[in-house]
Amino acid sequence: MEITKTLPKDFPRNPNKFCDFCGYKNYCYKGDDLMILPENKRRDLNEVTKKTIWLYGKPFSGKTTFANKFPEPLMLNTDGNIKFVDAPYIPIKDEVSVTGRLTHRKFAWQIFKEAVDELEKKENSFKTIIVDLLEDLYEYCRLYMYDQLGITHESDDSFRAWDKVRIEFLSTIKRLMNLDYENIILISHEDTSKDITRKSGDKVTAIKPNLNDKVANKIAGMVDIVARVYVDEKQRVLSFKSDEVVFGGGRLKLRAKEINLDYEKFEEVYKCI
């Protein structure tokens, strides 16, 4: 004979001393729902509360100095070039310690991830987070993943390694870009080593950040603006141009294609959206 057990449909509340350790206590007692929907009201797009920017340019063009002018900055620095900026910084580099005859290495990528963990807690007074340089972080991520996968290059495990490195890097950068700070700035060097062929057949030099194309396109989708910094006749320029030659632009409706590399003038760009 088949026995069918009827499952209860009602689960009456049974308050006890263990309720204090339950993550659903407020929901059970007060009806608080953490997944509440936003108010059905259009947002004011002119009220910008967070800026995300990706700057790139040749060395000594003024990228780091410009980023240093943003309020309450913290630099996550990979190349050690912090002599002429006064922002507090975290050096992102391998840490090597020796215990007896054993050498222990902590990868730079692990240092960066720990910094992101701390920044997520918001137990600080920083308003601007600066990554200088982004391509160095990508290389650090590669080296860390080589160690994790037991390989010396992505081609050693071509079916998985490329994707694993890219996913590890982009998912961590996305965590950084989602942090609740007023300004998040990424800095890269400029790459002019590749030529492209225009529709007319002419070959020209592409101007873009020094980062893998697939990764660069993903990063561009995480920021408001991709801007190039260059020096023109002793004047430093911040360019938002984007065409088949120059990598740049963004999701903002910018009135000016170029401005002087000046913090106050850049602030006006957001005010004039």
Residue ranges and their predicted role:
Residues 1-35:
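RecB-family 4Fe-4S metal-dependent nuclease core
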Residues 17, 68, 124, 179-180, ...:
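Structured loop/turn residues at beta-strand edges in well-structured enzyme cores
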Residues 36-131, 135-140:
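Conserved P-loop
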Residues 73-75, 184, 226-228:
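Short, well-ordered beta-strand core segments
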Residues 178, 191-273:
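Conserved GTP-binding G-domain of TRAFAC-class P-loop NTPases and closely related GTPase folds
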